[in-house]
Amino acid sequence: AEEEMSVFSAESRVEDVARALLFAPYGRLLFPVQSGYMDGDTLGSLRLTWYSHISPARTVAVVNRLAADAAAGHRIFYPIYTEEEMRRDPAKRDTGLFFFRGLTGAPVAVVSAGGGFAYVGAMQDSFPHALVLSERGVNAFALIYRPRAQTECEDLSRAVAFLHEHAAELGVDMRGYSLWGGSAGARMAAWVGSHGTEAFGQRSYPRPAAVIMQYTGLSEVYGTEPPTYSCVGTADGIASWQTMQRRTQAIRRNGQAAEIEV
């Protein structure tokens, strides 16, 4: 009955959400497919490795938003690789884009969660962002990728290519699109933003209008950065705010717009 009503709660079991018919056959990708990085049996008790301050209310809101869209007949997930590509490389079956719809014809944000290049922490680090962006009219896509720096950038580049090629079908405008990410996801956004999709196996597509980065100690500056916004906390034990501040200053010295919020 819970699924038929398209309503989940903090007491809903993670296993039941992942197997819900509304999300079939991609519900498993709502949560880490790599073992050992998730604790908790319910949406309310869900915890992800390296993250704190996860909001059960936001987790429930994310799941219910996707469920409501699916119940209304909207497609909520798009594979980024063809069936033949996934057959040749089964790991590519664990990739794709969850679509949080904004306004028809509005710009696009692609949001990539962190996870230490080991797993995808989407329920903490990309789904909540995509939900809020969509509520503000932006068409937000949360990327599920293959962890590891190279494959992450390949998957993000493929996602950008997919969105450009299917923009009309999706009802989105790729002009002025942005790349968002936290932790490892922020590095993905920065690398693809700076080097372009052509550096990671795709043909050249327009660079993003902006890169939005959260809490990652990336220091490299190549002189090809898009306008960049960064934010980080002073008490972050993993990402150095000083490193992020120095990078922001270096981007500015190259004549590009860059801001940081500490």
For each of these PLM feature ranges, what is it?
Residues 106-115:
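Short beta-strand element of the alpha/beta-hydrolase
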Residues 226, 240-250:
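Short alpha-helix in the alpha/beta-hydrolase fold that links the catalytic acid
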Residues 122-141:
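Short amphipathic alpha-helix adjacent to the substrate-entry channel of hydrolases
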Residues 1-93:
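N-terminal targeting or regulatory segments adjacent to alpha/beta-hydrolase or S9 domains
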Residues 154, 158-225:
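Primarily recognizes the serine-hydrolase "nucleophile elbow" in alpha/beta-hydrolase
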Residues 252-262:
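Catalytic histidine neighborhood in serine/cysteine hydrolases
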Residues 229-232, 236:
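Short beta-strand/loop motif that positions the catalytic acidic residue
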Residues 88-101, 107-108:
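A short loop-to-beta-strand scaffold at the N-terminal edge of the catalytic core in hydrolase folds
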